[in-house]
Amino acid sequence: NTAFGFAIGIQMLMWGLTGPIFGALADRYGGHIAIISAFIFYTLGIYFLYTGPNTGIYFQIHMGLLIGIGLGGTAISIPMSVVGKHFPLSTRTIAMSIVTAIGSFGYFLSPIFTTYSLKEYGWNYTLFIFTLFLITGLFAAYFVRSPSEIESVEKTSDQSFKEALSEAFKTKSYILLVSGFFVCGFHI
């Protein structure tokens, strides 16, 4: 379906564009603010798919724009950076590995649950259940706090977002990495 494909294209574009914004928000105000903000967009997108009109521009706004913005702050990058800041170097790898494993298990269970729910209850009720899951995540994100000063955690810099972008785009390996991901999206 063209409308669905276009919405997913918008979603992926918004995810990529808003990820750095949520990263800057997390650095400046704390991971919980970035994740809560993203969960609000994500939850509204799913909720409006459940309750609102779902044709034309509304579908593109709900499925593409709102959910895409929400993914920018709830997908793996922002939560992993928050987890990384909570642990000293000696235990950071194991902590991040556990979070990645739990997230991957969620990716494994989600299609199974979704398929079952769609067959048994239909798409509307399935969207309602996902709205409840996201509300749970929204409340859980409230309890994510910035870590207190830990001696073994390296000192963070006071670099601004603009300075960080400038430094990144002067680094050849970063430009190659971004180019690789950019090319990946041309199939959309």
List each model region and its residues.
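Hydrophobic core of transmembrane alpha-helices in multi-pass small-molecule transporters
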Residues: 56-74, 182
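Intracellular juxtamembrane helix-capping segments at the cytosolic ends
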Residues: 73-87
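Helix-loop-helix hairpin linking two adjacent transmembrane segments in secondary transporters
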Residues: 98-149
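C-terminal ends and interior cores of transmembrane alpha-helices
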Residues: 40-54
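Extracytoplasmic gate region of multi-pass secondary transporters
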Residues: 172-188
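Residue-level signature of mid-helix packing/kink "hotspots" within the transmembrane helices
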Residues: 12-20, 107-108
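Helix-to-loop junctions at the C-terminal end of transmembrane segments
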Residues: 18-30
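Flexible cytoplasmic inter-helical loops of multi-pass small-molecule transporters
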Residues: 145-163
